[in-house]
């Protein structure tokens, strides 16, 4: 530890820390623009100047390492004058257009100019003006406001892992731009908006919509992937205006994916706001009572074993649990959250989780990807892995036809024999796995989405056992899930095998990806919030609330249950999921023993211990899975997906549609350059 004095008070701080960090630890406010705790140090804005005794000039505190016996002053006349000078330089070419800037009210430059600026301007020459750069459909630029802090450049390089933003020219003529002014290629590019300290980078979908003080903030969870990123929903009245990240060091740090951030406009389109019944081949708007009575009559006319329920990809645990209880009361055990027919072993909880945990990947030294498209399935997790690779702390190898990643990967091939050789210890990478202290395997849908998924999973378990990847001090076996609801559904046993051909009544709880051709003779009830495939195939439609319109628990891929809070009211005559299921039970005169959300959660916590530990990861058992199924010789390949359209909300998002179009245009432009 190093001892130093800051404004007369002695503190201790670890060696290697900066003067800025020491000042913050001492409780001092140090203005800054270029410094960001999660980015590499640049030291180019000079706003964080402090006075250090025996130094003739003020020092940039963010770039100066501490040394023993340092005496630092943060509030002397020299420091004040230096900061005023720096601020004056920063404002020389700034347009001062705060009334029309989207950053107004939450702008670092505004706040620090007021707190540390002179209040007068001696510059009366013409200001420079810079042409706005095109960065795609998500980021709106106003580059005349840019103060060249380079935060966005460092984020692109160090966090996103794609070097697609840089600076051209020098001095006063310096400009920040994307290469060839193309659409940004990163799935987490929207985070540049958050870290920009001025109004140079803004959200295009949010442009000129609202001011910060007009918005209500609601803590929630991103449901468009299985990572469970913490988000903040900003709304005005009953309209969602924007979505921002909330800090959670164990999951998403301070970042979220572009899909979780921008696809909220999909909540405006194709919404189901009234109950419907199919009459004479056409869906007709009806009252709730008529829809519920029709369902009651149909359920009573069908044998219990012919009734099945399928949950979709963004359904809360409470809704699935309540529907499961209802079906059990009816005498049916046909219910599943596995609408894609994934081959996932559920014999123990550790067999279907991401056991290493998201933050735990920073401890791993060797990672094997098998059939996993981690960049598009879990962009935030991918960013963590990429940062470890770039500093040389982690080596990543891959089996399976993959997709372009944001870091260096060594491809072993796509043959199943590679896994067989690893399992018996004859592959060239056997030595690397034996020497690795913390090896991990990430299994994607290129494995559990195959017809022989169980057989392949059994083979992978042999590799896990061979290299002792699951032990008391390290859990290296990981399933990379695609959807927000699947782990929660597996946790409550909402996962029985269903033969669709024999189903006479299908209850679709937001499920749109099932084999509808096998349900041609079934009566279909669709409970959901968007008019997608499921609604178009339904005989009765029950409009429900989206995840922003009701509170619900979601369990992320590492097994952490979290609560998404209600931000706005349901549209039209739509109701919350558990309210609809409770009303159906009432019409059937079935007592499911739960009248409200609180009672559902109390019962969940009693029956499943994990739900008594919200926001926590519990210890889980893992057992080796053995399958007698036959392996095919089909090459392993991660399943291709359209990243921007993976669920009913993102499919109906205009912003996501623009992203798809922009990415296609980028591919065509790149092809022109190289071919």
Swiss-Prot record:
User: What are the residue boundaries of the 4Fe-4S His(Cys)3-ligated-type domain, all occurrences included?
Assistant: 78-117
Catalytic activity reported: a quinone + NADH + 5 H(+)(in) = a quinol + NAD(+) + 4 H(+)(out)
Positions contributing to [4Fe-4S] cluster 1 binding: 94, 98, 101, 107
Name the positions where [4Fe-4S] cluster 2 binds: 146, 149, 152, 196
Q: Which cofactor does it need?
A: [2Fe-2S] cluster; [4Fe-4S] cluster
Give the binding site residues for [2Fe-2S] cluster. Answer: 34, 45, 48, 62
Entry GO CC: membrane
What does this protein's record comment on cofactor binding?
Binds 1 [2Fe-2S] cluster per subunit.
EC number(s) per UniProt?
A: 7.1.1.-
Cross-referenced SUPFAM superfamilies: 2Fe-2S ferredoxin-like (SSF54292), 4Fe-4S ferredoxins (SSF54862), Formate dehydrogenase/DMSO reductase, domains 1-3 (SSF53706)
Stated family:
Belongs to the complex I 75 kDa subunit family.
What function does the entry list?
NDH-1 shuttles electrons from NADH, via FMN and iron-sulfur (Fe-S) centers, to quinones in the respiratory chain. Couples the redox reaction to proton translocation (for every two electrons transferred, four hydrogen ions are translocated across the cytoplasmic membrane), and thus conserves the redox energy in a proton gradient.
**What protein is this chain from?**
NADH-quinone oxidoreductase subunit G
């Amino acid at each position: 530890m190093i001892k130093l004095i800051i404004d007369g008070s002695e503190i201790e701080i670890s060696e290697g820390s900066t003067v800025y960090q020491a000042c913050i630890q001492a409780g001092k406010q140090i203005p800054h623009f270029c410094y960001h705790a999660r980015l590499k140090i640049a030291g180019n804005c000079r706003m964080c100047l402090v006075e250090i005794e025996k130094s003739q000039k003020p020092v940039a505190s963010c770039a100066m390492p501490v040394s023993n016996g340092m005496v630092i002053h943060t509030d002397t006349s020299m420091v004040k004058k230096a900061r005023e000078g720096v601020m004056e330089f920063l404002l020389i070419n700034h347009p001062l257009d705060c009334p029309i800037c989207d950053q107004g009210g939450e702008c670092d430059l505004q706040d620090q100019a007021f707190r540390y600026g002179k209040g007068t301007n001696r510059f009366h020459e013409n200001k420079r003006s810079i042409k706005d750069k095109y960065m795609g459909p998500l980021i709106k630029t106003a580059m005349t406001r840019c103060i060249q802090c380079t935060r966005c450049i460092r984020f692109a390089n160090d966090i996103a892992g794609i070097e697609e933003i840089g600076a051209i020219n020098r001095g006063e003529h310096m400009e920040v731009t994307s290469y060839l002014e193309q659409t940004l290629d990163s799935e987490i590019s929207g985070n540049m908006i958050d870290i920009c300290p001025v109004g140079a980078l803004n959200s295009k979908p949010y442009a000129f919509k609202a001011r910060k003080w007009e918005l209500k903030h609601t803590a929630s969870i991103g449901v468009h992937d299985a990572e469970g990123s913490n988000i903040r929903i900003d709304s005005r009245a009953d309209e969602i205006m924007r979505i921002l990240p909330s800090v959670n060091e164990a999951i998403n740090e301070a970042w979220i994916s572009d899909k979780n951030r921008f696809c909220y406009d999909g909540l405006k389109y194709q919404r189901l706001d009234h109950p419907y019944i199919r009459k004479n081949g056409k869906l007709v708007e009806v009252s709730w009572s008529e829809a519920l009575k029709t369902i009651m009559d149909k359920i009573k006319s069908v044998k219990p074993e012919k009734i099945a329920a399928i949950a979709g990809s963004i359904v809360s645990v409470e809704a699935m649990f309540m529907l499961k209880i209802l079906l059990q009361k009816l005498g049916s055990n046909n219910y599943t959250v596995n609408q894609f027919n994934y081959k996932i072993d559920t014999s123990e909880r550790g067999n279907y989780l991401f056991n290493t945990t998201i933050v735990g990947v920073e401890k791993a030294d060797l990672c094997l990807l098998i059939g996993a498209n981690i960049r598009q399935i879990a962009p935030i997790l991918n960013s963590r892995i990429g940062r470890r690779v770039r500093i040389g702390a982690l080596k990543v190898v891959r089996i399976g036809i993959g997709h372009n990643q944001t870091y260096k990967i060594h491809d072993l091939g796509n043959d199943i024999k590679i896994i067989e050789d690893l399992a018996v210890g004859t592959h060239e990478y056997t030595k690397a796995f034996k020497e690795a202290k913390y090896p991990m395997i990430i299994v994607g849908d290129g494995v559990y989405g195959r017809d022989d998924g169980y057989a392949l999973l059994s083979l992978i378990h042999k590799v896990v056992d061979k290299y002792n990847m699951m032990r008391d001090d390290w859990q290296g076996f990981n399933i990379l899930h695609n959807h927000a609801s699947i782990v929660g559904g597996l946790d409550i046993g909402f996962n029985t095998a269903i033969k669709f051909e024999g189903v006479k009544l299908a209850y679709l709880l937001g499920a749109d990806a099932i084999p509808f051709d096998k349900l041609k003779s079934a009566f279909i009830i669709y409970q959901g919030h968007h008019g997608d495939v499921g609604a178009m195939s339904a005989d009765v439609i029950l409009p429900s609330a989206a995840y922003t319109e009701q509170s619900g628990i979601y369990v992320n891929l590492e097994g952490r249950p979290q609560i998404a809070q209600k931000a706005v009211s349901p549209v039209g005559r739509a109701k919350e999921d558990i309210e609809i299921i409770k009303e159906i039970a009432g019409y059937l005169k079935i007592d499911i023993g739960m009248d409200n959300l609180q009672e559902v959660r109390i019962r969940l916590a009693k029956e499943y211990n994990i739900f008594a530990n919200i926001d926590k990861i519990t210890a889980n058992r893992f057992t080796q899975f053995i399958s007698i199924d036959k392996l095919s010789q089909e090459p392993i390949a991660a399943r291709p997906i359209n990243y921007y359209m993976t669920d009913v909300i993102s499919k109906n998002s205009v912003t996501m549609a623009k992203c798809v179009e922009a990415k296609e245009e980028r591919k065509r432009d790149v092809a022109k350059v190289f071919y």
